[in-house]
From Swiss-Prot:
GO terms for molecular function: FAD binding; UDP-N-acetylmuramate dehydrogenase activity. Gene3D superfamilies: 3.30.465.10, UDP-N-acetylenolpyruvoylglucosamine reductase, C-terminal domain, Uridine Diphospho-n-acetylenolpyruvylglucosamine Reductase, domain 2. Keywords: Cell cycle, Cell division, Cell shape, Cell wall biogenesis/degradation, Cytoplasm, FAD, Flavoprotein, NADP, Oxidoreductase, Peptidoglycan synthesis. This is UDP-N-acetylenolpyruvoylglucosamine reductase. It comes from Methylorubrum extorquens (strain CM4 / NCIMB 13688) (Methylobacterium extorquens). Signal peptide: none annotated. Residues 34-221 form the FAD-binding PCMH-type domain. Cell wall formation. Its EC number is 1.3.1.98. It is found in: Cytoplasm. PROSITE patterns: FAD_PCMH (PS51387). The gene is murB. Its cofactor is FAD.
Protein backbone atom coordinates (compact mmCIF):
# COMPACT_ATOMS: atom_id res chain seq x y z
CA UNK A 1 0.00 0.00 0.00
CA UNK A 2 1.34 3.44 -0.92
CA UNK A 3 1.60 6.20 1.66
CA UNK A 4 -1.19 8.13 -0.06
CA UNK A 5 -3.59 5.18 -0.10
CA UNK A 6 -2.73 4.38 3.53
CA UNK A 7 -3.63 7.92 4.58
CA UNK A 8 -6.87 7.71 2.58
CA UNK A 9 -7.75 4.46 4.36
CA UNK A 10 -6.99 6.00 7.75
CA UNK A 11 -9.11 9.09 7.06
CA UNK A 12 -11.98 6.93 5.86
CA UNK A 13 -11.85 4.81 9.02
CA UNK A 14 -11.38 7.78 11.37
CA UNK A 15 -12.83 10.90 9.70
CA UNK A 16 -12.79 12.95 12.92
CA UNK A 17 -9.06 12.81 13.55
CA UNK A 18 -7.64 16.15 14.69
CA UNK A 19 -3.94 15.31 14.57
CA UNK A 20 -1.55 15.74 11.62
CA UNK A 21 -1.06 12.99 9.03
CA UNK A 22 1.93 13.37 6.71
CA UNK A 23 3.13 11.03 3.99
CA UNK A 24 6.73 10.11 3.17
CA UNK A 25 7.99 12.46 5.87
CA UNK A 26 11.75 12.68 6.36
CA UNK A 27 12.85 11.53 9.81
CA UNK A 28 16.50 12.52 9.58
CA UNK A 29 15.79 15.95 11.07
CA UNK A 30 13.95 14.31 13.98
CA UNK A 31 16.94 12.24 15.14
CA UNK A 32 20.11 13.42 16.83
CA UNK A 33 22.27 11.50 14.36
CA UNK A 34 20.57 13.39 11.51
CA UNK A 35 20.35 10.24 9.38
CA UNK A 36 17.64 7.88 8.16
CA UNK A 37 14.90 7.46 5.62
CA UNK A 38 11.29 8.67 5.66
CA UNK A 39 8.22 7.56 7.57
CA UNK A 40 5.69 6.15 5.13
CA UNK A 41 3.06 7.92 7.26
CA UNK A 42 3.81 10.18 10.24
CA UNK A 43 0.98 10.85 12.70
CA UNK A 44 1.08 13.49 15.44
CA UNK A 45 -2.08 13.11 17.55
CA UNK A 46 -3.81 16.14 19.03
CA UNK A 47 -4.28 14.49 22.43
CA UNK A 48 -4.83 11.14 24.11
CA UNK A 49 -8.41 10.80 22.85
CA UNK A 50 -7.24 11.47 19.29
CA UNK A 51 -4.52 8.83 19.62
CA UNK A 52 -7.02 6.33 21.03
CA UNK A 53 -9.44 6.91 18.14
CA UNK A 54 -6.62 6.61 15.62
CA UNK A 55 -5.39 3.29 16.98
CA UNK A 56 -8.90 1.89 17.30
CA UNK A 57 -9.56 2.67 13.62
CA UNK A 58 -6.18 1.58 12.24
CA UNK A 59 -6.01 -1.72 10.40
CA UNK A 60 -4.21 -4.08 12.83
CA UNK A 61 -2.00 -5.34 9.99
CA UNK A 62 -0.39 -1.90 9.59
CA UNK A 63 2.85 -1.71 11.57
CA UNK A 64 3.14 1.08 14.14
CA UNK A 65 6.40 2.62 15.35
CA UNK A 66 6.73 5.26 18.06
CA UNK A 67 9.54 7.81 18.21
CA UNK A 68 10.33 10.52 20.75
CA UNK A 69 13.09 13.11 20.68
CA UNK A 70 15.27 10.82 18.56
CA UNK A 71 18.24 10.97 20.91
CA UNK A 72 18.69 7.23 21.37
CA UNK A 73 17.72 6.17 17.88
CA UNK A 74 18.99 5.07 14.49
CA UNK A 75 16.39 5.20 11.72
CA UNK A 76 17.66 2.99 8.91
CA UNK A 77 18.14 4.48 5.45
CA UNK A 78 15.12 2.74 3.90
CA UNK A 79 12.79 4.47 6.34
CA UNK A 80 9.90 3.12 8.39
CA UNK A 81 6.98 1.33 6.71
CA UNK A 82 3.46 1.72 8.03
CA UNK A 83 2.68 4.42 10.58
CA UNK A 84 5.18 6.28 12.73
CA UNK A 85 3.69 8.10 15.73
CA UNK A 86 5.37 11.08 17.37
CA UNK A 87 3.77 12.64 20.42
CA UNK A 88 4.11 16.36 21.07
CA UNK A 89 2.30 19.55 21.96
CA UNK A 90 0.69 20.58 25.22
CA UNK A 91 -1.36 17.38 25.53
CA UNK A 92 1.76 15.23 25.88
CA UNK A 93 4.29 17.88 26.85
CA UNK A 94 3.07 19.31 30.16
CA UNK A 95 4.27 18.84 33.74
CA UNK A 96 1.96 19.27 36.75
CA UNK A 97 3.07 19.13 40.38
CA UNK A 98 0.87 18.52 43.42
CA UNK A 99 2.81 18.24 46.65
CA UNK A 100 5.38 15.48 46.15
CA UNK A 101 3.56 14.08 43.09
CA UNK A 102 4.72 14.96 39.58
CA UNK A 103 2.55 14.19 36.56
CA UNK A 104 4.25 14.40 33.20
CA UNK A 105 3.37 13.83 29.59
CA UNK A 106 5.67 11.43 27.80
CA UNK A 107 6.85 14.02 25.26
CA UNK A 108 8.42 16.07 28.06
CA UNK A 109 12.23 16.15 27.75
CA UNK A 110 13.90 14.44 30.70
CA UNK A 111 15.94 17.57 31.37
CA UNK A 112 12.76 19.66 31.69
CA UNK A 113 11.29 17.11 34.11
CA UNK A 114 14.38 17.51 36.29
CA UNK A 115 14.10 21.31 36.13
CA UNK A 116 10.41 21.30 37.06
CA UNK A 117 11.07 19.06 40.05
CA UNK A 118 13.93 21.29 41.22
CA UNK A 119 11.77 24.42 40.94
CA UNK A 120 9.25 22.71 43.23
CA UNK A 121 12.06 21.78 45.67
CA UNK A 122 11.55 18.07 44.99
CA UNK A 123 14.64 15.90 45.24
CA UNK A 124 15.35 12.56 43.59
CA UNK A 125 14.91 13.52 39.93
CA UNK A 126 18.11 15.51 39.34
CA UNK A 127 19.64 12.56 37.46
CA UNK A 128 17.17 13.21 34.62
CA UNK A 129 19.25 16.33 33.88
CA UNK A 130 21.86 14.03 32.37
CA UNK A 131 19.52 12.12 30.05
CA UNK A 132 19.03 13.63 26.55
CA UNK A 133 15.69 12.00 25.80
CA UNK A 134 12.00 12.22 26.65
CA UNK A 135 9.96 10.73 29.46
CA UNK A 136 8.44 8.13 27.12
CA UNK A 137 11.84 6.76 26.20
CA UNK A 138 12.94 6.80 29.83
CA UNK A 139 9.94 4.65 30.74
CA UNK A 140 10.54 2.16 27.96
CA UNK A 141 14.21 1.55 28.82
CA UNK A 142 14.40 2.49 32.52
CA UNK A 143 16.80 5.27 31.60
CA UNK A 144 19.31 6.36 34.19
CA UNK A 145 22.40 8.44 34.76
CA UNK A 146 24.67 9.61 37.56
CA UNK A 147 23.44 7.09 40.11
CA UNK A 148 19.71 7.36 39.47
CA UNK A 149 17.20 5.41 37.37
CA UNK A 150 13.61 5.93 36.30
CA UNK A 151 12.51 3.03 38.49
CA UNK A 152 13.66 4.94 41.59
CA UNK A 153 10.96 7.62 41.31
CA UNK A 154 8.16 6.16 39.16
CA UNK A 155 4.69 5.57 40.61
CA UNK A 156 2.45 4.83 37.62
CA UNK A 157 2.33 4.93 33.82
CA UNK A 158 -0.59 5.58 31.50
CA UNK A 159 -0.67 4.16 27.97
CA UNK A 160 -2.82 3.12 25.02
CA UNK A 161 -2.69 -0.24 23.24
CA UNK A 162 -3.17 -1.07 19.54
CA UNK A 163 -6.92 -1.40 20.07
CA UNK A 164 -7.11 2.15 21.40
CA UNK A 165 -7.78 1.03 24.96
CA UNK A 166 -6.28 3.01 27.85
CA UNK A 167 -4.27 1.16 30.49
CA UNK A 168 -2.52 2.07 33.73
CA UNK A 169 0.63 0.28 34.85
CA UNK A 170 1.87 0.29 38.41
CA UNK A 171 5.58 0.43 39.16
CA UNK A 172 5.58 -3.34 39.72
CA UNK A 173 3.77 -3.98 36.43
CA UNK A 174 6.45 -2.07 34.51
CA UNK A 175 8.93 -4.83 35.39
CA UNK A 176 11.99 -2.60 35.40
CA UNK A 177 15.51 -3.91 35.24
CA UNK A 178 18.76 -2.48 33.86
CA UNK A 179 17.87 -0.44 30.74
CA UNK A 180 14.66 -2.41 30.23
CA UNK A 181 10.99 -2.52 31.12
CA UNK A 182 8.60 -5.44 30.67
CA UNK A 183 5.62 -3.32 29.63
CA UNK A 184 3.87 -4.63 26.49
CA UNK A 185 5.62 -3.51 23.31
CA UNK A 186 2.36 -2.45 21.65
CA UNK A 187 1.48 0.07 24.36
CA UNK A 188 2.19 3.73 23.63
CA UNK A 189 2.97 5.58 26.85
CA UNK A 190 1.12 8.88 27.17
CA UNK A 191 1.76 9.98 30.74
CA UNK A 192 3.56 9.10 33.95
CA UNK A 193 3.37 9.88 37.64
CA UNK A 194 6.54 10.31 39.65
CA UNK A 195 7.18 10.99 43.31
CA UNK A 196 9.93 13.21 44.61
CA UNK A 197 10.91 13.98 48.16
CA UNK A 198 11.10 17.39 49.81
CA UNK A 199 14.51 18.97 49.46
CA UNK A 200 16.41 22.22 49.29
CA UNK A 201 16.04 23.92 45.92
CA UNK A 202 19.54 25.39 45.91
CA UNK A 203 21.10 22.02 46.76
CA UNK A 204 19.06 20.26 44.06
CA UNK A 205 20.01 22.86 41.44
CA UNK A 206 23.66 22.54 42.48
CA UNK A 207 23.41 18.78 41.93
CA UNK A 208 21.90 19.38 38.49
CA UNK A 209 24.76 21.72 37.63
CA UNK A 210 27.20 19.02 38.73
CA UNK A 211 25.45 16.48 36.48
CA UNK A 212 25.56 18.92 33.56
CA UNK A 213 29.25 19.69 34.07
CA UNK A 214 30.14 16.01 34.34
CA UNK A 215 28.25 15.25 31.14
CA UNK A 216 29.87 18.10 29.22
CA UNK A 217 33.34 17.09 30.42
CA UNK A 218 33.02 13.42 29.49
CA UNK A 219 30.61 13.15 26.55
CA UNK A 220 30.64 14.54 22.98
CA UNK A 221 27.38 16.41 23.46
CA UNK A 222 28.21 19.01 20.79
CA UNK A 223 28.42 16.28 18.13
CA UNK A 224 25.67 14.54 16.19
CA UNK A 225 25.38 11.47 18.37
CA UNK A 226 22.70 9.18 19.71
CA UNK A 227 24.08 9.03 23.23
CA UNK A 228 25.38 5.93 24.98
CA UNK A 229 25.59 3.20 22.33
CA UNK A 230 25.94 -0.07 24.22
CA UNK A 231 24.71 -1.29 27.58
CA UNK A 232 27.35 -2.05 30.19
CA UNK A 233 27.72 -5.84 30.33
CA UNK A 234 27.77 -7.58 33.68
CA UNK A 235 31.30 -7.40 35.02
CA UNK A 236 32.52 -4.67 32.67
CA UNK A 237 32.10 -1.15 31.33
CA UNK A 238 31.32 -0.80 27.64
CA UNK A 239 33.68 2.14 27.04
CA UNK A 240 36.63 0.36 28.65
CA UNK A 241 36.04 -2.78 26.58
CA UNK A 242 35.74 -0.72 23.39
CA UNK A 243 38.92 1.18 24.19
CA UNK A 244 40.85 -1.99 25.03
CA UNK A 245 39.78 -3.50 21.70
CA UNK A 246 41.43 -0.59 19.87
CA UNK A 247 38.21 1.03 18.67
CA UNK A 248 38.64 4.58 19.96
CA UNK A 249 38.45 6.87 16.91
CA UNK A 250 37.53 3.99 14.55
CA UNK A 251 35.93 5.27 11.32
CA UNK A 252 33.45 3.80 8.86
CA UNK A 253 32.21 6.09 6.11
CA UNK A 254 30.98 9.26 7.77
CA UNK A 255 30.65 7.61 11.19
CA UNK A 256 33.26 7.49 13.94
CA UNK A 257 33.75 6.12 17.44
CA UNK A 258 34.17 9.23 19.57
CA UNK A 259 37.70 10.04 20.68
CA UNK A 260 36.23 11.72 23.76
CA UNK A 261 34.05 8.82 24.96
CA UNK A 262 34.27 5.62 22.99
CA UNK A 263 30.81 4.35 23.92
CA UNK A 264 29.48 7.16 21.70
CA UNK A 265 29.22 6.98 17.91
CA UNK A 266 29.17 10.26 16.01
CA UNK A 267 28.15 11.45 12.57
CA UNK A 268 31.21 13.35 11.31
CA UNK A 269 29.15 14.69 8.41
CA UNK A 270 27.61 12.81 5.53
CA UNK A 271 27.18 9.54 7.41
CA UNK A 272 24.37 7.17 6.54
CA UNK A 273 22.45 5.11 9.04
CA UNK A 274 24.21 2.08 7.54
CA UNK A 275 27.58 3.69 8.32
CA UNK A 276 26.65 4.20 11.95
CA UNK A 277 25.02 0.82 12.52
CA UNK A 278 27.79 -0.94 10.61
CA UNK A 279 30.41 0.78 12.75
CA UNK A 280 28.58 -0.32 15.87
CA UNK A 281 28.53 -3.93 14.66
CA UNK A 282 32.26 -3.74 13.90
CA UNK A 283 32.89 -2.51 17.44
CA UNK A 284 30.84 -5.40 18.82
CA UNK A 285 32.87 -7.87 16.75
CA UNK A 286 36.21 -6.48 17.87
CA UNK A 287 35.22 -6.43 21.53
CA UNK A 288 33.96 -10.01 21.30
CA UNK A 289 37.22 -11.17 19.73
CA UNK A 290 39.42 -9.21 22.14
CA UNK A 291 37.75 -9.88 25.49
CA UNK A 292 34.93 -12.36 24.97
CA UNK A 293 32.33 -9.82 26.13
CA UNK A 294 29.14 -9.50 24.10
CA UNK A 295 27.99 -5.89 23.84
CA UNK A 296 24.28 -5.26 23.41
CA UNK A 297 22.87 -2.17 21.76
CA UNK A 298 21.39 0.48 24.02
CA UNK A 299 20.51 2.64 21.02
CA UNK A 300 17.29 1.56 19.35
CA UNK A 301 17.54 0.73 15.64
CA UNK A 302 14.33 0.82 13.61
CA UNK A 303 13.15 0.77 10.01
CA UNK A 304 14.44 -1.05 6.96
CA UNK A 305 17.71 -0.87 5.10
CA UNK A 306 17.86 1.06 1.84
CA UNK A 307 17.32 -0.95 -1.33
CA UNK A 308 20.49 -1.61 -3.33
CA UNK A 309 21.12 1.02 -5.98
Amino acid sequence: MTAHSLIDAIRAAAPDLRGRLLENQSLADLTWFRVGGPAQVLFSPADEADLSAFLAALDPSVPVTVIGLGSNLIVRDGGIPGVTIRLGGKAFGSVEIDGETIRSGTAVPDMRLAKAAAEASLDGLAFFRGIPGSVGGALRMNAGAHGGETTDVLVEVRGIDRKGEVHRFTHAEMGFRYRHSSAPDDVIFTGATFRGRPGDREAIEAEMERVTAAREAAQPIRERTGGSTFKNPEGGKAWQLIDAAGCRGLIRGGAQVSEMHCNFLINRGGATAADIEGLGEEVRRRVREHSGFELHWEIKRIGVEASPA
